[in-house]
Amino acid sequence: MENTILVGIVTQAQGIEKSKDYLDELDFLTITAGGKVLKRFVQRMNMPNPKTFIGSGKILEIKEFILANDVNTVIFDDELSPTQERNISKIFNCKVLDRTNLILDIFAQRATTSYAKTQVELAQCQYLLPRLKGMWTHLERQKGGIGMRGPGETEIETDRRIVRDKISLLKEKIKSIDKQMHVQRGNRGKLIRVAIVGYTNVGKSTIMNLLSKSKVFAEDKLFATLDTTVRKIVIRNLPFLLSDTVGFIRKLPTQLIESFKSTLDEVREADLLLHVVDISHSNFEEHIGAVEKTLDEIKSLGKPSIMVFNKIDNYEPVNYDKDDLIAERDKSNFSIEEWEHTWMNKLGDKVKFISAINKTNIEELKECLYNEVRKIHITRFPYNDFLYPEIN
């Protein structure tokens, strides 16, 4: 495992709590990529330094730690400009990555099909292009590892023109595969399409396995699923298609949204979304916002959806001391029952609280899914009403 340190900032727009949450996520991403986090460095500032992102004092502090602890990699929570990345790596004399680079690296690890690998390679090349000039030339002795997978290692010193040509070739290859996949989606017939969406590592693949009774790769790591899986599901003789899609994440690189167009087409072309949320995460509401932001970017926000709050078995409200006259009770103290009477109540019967691991309330989820798919089916094929009885 590579010795790694993380760097984040606290600003007026991003307070201490939010910064900590982002760094917790970056920590998990680093572990997923194969790194060992030795320490976190955080600096409060009004805005990032245009040359080195953080201030000179913090730069010196980090450099001393790097020298004393044999650090291989420094990862910044925010995307660095090519200039910032170049300047910082020269000062630290080690690999310097940002969140985008790290996510791209994990995707390179997770890609299993030729199509997924092509998508990741395109995203990496697009990220690499403006950073070619002098990028890590002083690190030739340290090839490989986090941030150096895919085209990262083999094309560090490649001419911009060659990378541009490669981007064009990859786009053509993806366009060709997209056409094939579009035809394949068309060949699925008139079955209703349901797409499972949600933040990364919320249990989407586990739910897919429960509903389809088939094995889809599921693991307690970020981006365990990269390739879209589609299964035909039958509930009470009502057939429909269910697809498990790549997880969303805050600060999702735009290169990935563009490169994974066809994967996200499963969401765009879905008739119904199953939005899975990890309710045990302290910032699950912000995760919902991140997913909805991405759905909005791909013009899928207004689709019919069922909100599935997973991992109720892990949910633990923060203890509230009634005798404490200063402390105020807030959302962190809510029980599941109290959450049900917040904004979630407006979702009516389109919200379910489950535990995919313990199979709690899975039958209720199936009934809800049946009813929603049935509504869409009857609207589309009114003469089939008698085939699928309504569940009371």
PLM feature spans:
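Short alpha-helix plus adjacent loop in nuclease-associated cores
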Residues: 101-120
